[in-house]
């Protein structure tokens, strides 16, 4: 059967007693739409926790190569199981839309389509644009610290090098702007849409709200000077479709929120 995967840092997210659902439970916040609408038609649903979140091991590498390789390994595993027909899709909103682009940038032959819903395509342009840094850039990496916390004595083991680098990179980008020494390494590593172009061999169904002030539409319709990523993928010969409308950082059926 074909597989639709949701790849997220948000499984079992939060303090004990109030955490979100784990990977073995389908909830309204993540895979329920896929479960209700695609499982009856012969698809499988996979819920995947990125490195160092929920029960996944490894170092939490916020949108970095480590995280991308972990996602790639999951796609390869899903595409090679006896019950799988080898075709994998990744679907999700916001961070879970970003993981779709991380997978695309790895170029797995099993990844056949991605459905990024308000998904980040490149971290640097999200946090720094038009000559200034967004205020959230200084704490963006810290915001995901809760993803790696189990609230027990093992939490210190999760403070690995990639996590500590992220804590430094955010305030540095905010304070130094274009003088940021991380510009050419940390943030280039976390730009996925440019790496996927020409390497990814699948289709794209882009879903984006034009009133989204969290993951701005320029993540889809912008790019380096002279580049419109949406058009660039069409021009490169990709099968591209889009659901674009006047909603915020939500799913399209939540347009009134």
Task: Kindly give the residue locations of the regions a language model identified.
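Cap/lid segment of the alpha/beta-hydrolase catalytic domain
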Residues: 3-79
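Accessory cap/linker subdomain of secreted extracellular hydrolases
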Residues: 13-16, 20-24, 28-34, 40, ...
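Alpha/beta-hydrolase fold nucleophile elbow
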Residues: 82-95
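Alpha/beta-hydrolase-fold catalytic nucleophile elbow
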Residues: 91, 115-118, 207, 243-246
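Glycine-rich nucleophile elbow surrounding the catalytic serine of serine-hydrolase chemistry
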Residues: 92-102, 214
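Short beta-strand/loop motif that positions the catalytic acidic residue
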Residues: 200, 206-208, 212
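Conserved alpha/beta-hydrolase "acid-adjacent" motif
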Residues: 213-227
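Catalytic histidine neighborhood in serine/cysteine hydrolases
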Residues: 230-251
């Amino acid at each position: 059967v074909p597989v639709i995967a949701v790849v997220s840092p948000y499984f079992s997210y939060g303090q004990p007693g109030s955490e979100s659902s784990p990977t073995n439970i389908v909830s309204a916040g993540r895979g329920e739409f896929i479960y209700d609408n695609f499982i009856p038609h012969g698809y499988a649903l996979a819920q995947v926790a990125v490195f160092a979140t929920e029960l996944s091991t490894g170092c939490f590498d916020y949108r970095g190569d480590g995280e991308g390789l972990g996602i790639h390994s999951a796609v390869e595993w899903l595409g090679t199981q006896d019950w799988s027909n080898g075709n994998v899709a990744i679907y999700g909103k916001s961070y879970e839309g970003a993981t779709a682009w991380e997978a695309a940038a790895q170029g797995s032959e099993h990844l056949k389509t991605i459905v990024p819903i308000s998904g980040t395509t490149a971290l640097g342009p999200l946090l720094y644009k038009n000559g200034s840094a967004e205020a959230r850039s200084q704490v963006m990496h810290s915001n995901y610290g809760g993803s790696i916390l189990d609230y027990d004595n093992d939490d210190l083991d999760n403070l690995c090098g990639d996590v500590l680098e992220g804590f430094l990179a955010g305030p540095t980008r905010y304070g130094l702007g274009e003088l940021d020494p991380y510009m050419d390494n940390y943030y280039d590593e976390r730009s996925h849409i440019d790496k996927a172009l020409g390497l990814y061999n699948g289709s794209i169904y882009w879903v984006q709200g034009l009133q989204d002030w969290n993951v701005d539409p320029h993540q889809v319709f912008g790019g380096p000077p002279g580049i419109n990523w949406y058009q660039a993928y069409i021009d490169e010969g990709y099968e591209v479709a889009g659901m674009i409308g006047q909603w915020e950082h939500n799913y399209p059926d939540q347009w009134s929120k």
